[in-house]
């Protein structure tokens, strides 16, 4: 796996492509930030589960994707908001409601990576990483 400057965009793109190809899982290089994002996706039912494994002295994360009974992906869209070239920060009051509360916003806050409603409840803002619905 090559080095990318935006590992979050890489994660979202790999998930998007794997869902279109109806793959069961993806493998991606592990980082604490990516694990926190995938953990939030799992808590909200967007991915089935994930595990972290070490292979050839590299830590990899295997993310198992989730599909409905009709083999349609549970995730309809993933959108990267804040990018290395253009950071987007929001206050707690400006955290977006995604797709009529059917989706989630993922933020990097001083209290760690949080989902939008959790950050709103804690009255904390931060960098708006991505939107998922």
UniProtKB/Swiss-Prot annotation:
InterPro entries: Ribosomal_uS8, Ribosomal_uS8_CS, Ribosomal_uS8_sf. One of its GO terms (molecular function) is rRNA binding. Keywords: Ribonucleoprotein, Ribosomal protein, RNA-binding, rRNA-binding. GO terms for biological process: translation. Part of the 30S ribosomal subunit. Contacts proteins S5 and S12. HAMAP family: Ribosomal_uS8_B. Belongs to the universal ribosomal protein uS8 family. This is Small ribosomal subunit protein uS8. It comes from Chlamydia muridarum (strain MoPn / Nigg).
């Amino acid at each position: 796996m090559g080095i990318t400057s935006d590992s979050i965009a890489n994660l979202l793109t790999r998930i998007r492509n794997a869902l279109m190809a109806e793959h069961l899982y993806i493998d991606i290089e592990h980082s604490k930030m990516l694990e926190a994002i995938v953990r939030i996706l799992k808590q909200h039912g967007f991915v089935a589960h994930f595990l972290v494994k070490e292979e050839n002295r590299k830590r990899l994360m295997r993310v198992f994707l989730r599909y409905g009974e009709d083999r349609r992906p549970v995730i309809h869209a993933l959108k990267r908001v804040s990018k290395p070239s253009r950071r987007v920060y929001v206050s707690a009051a400006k955290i977006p409601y995604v797709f009529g509360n059917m989706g989630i916003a993922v933020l990097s806050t001083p209290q760690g990576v949080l989902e939008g409603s959790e950050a709103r409840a804690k009255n904390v803002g931060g960098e708006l990483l991505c939107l998922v619905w």
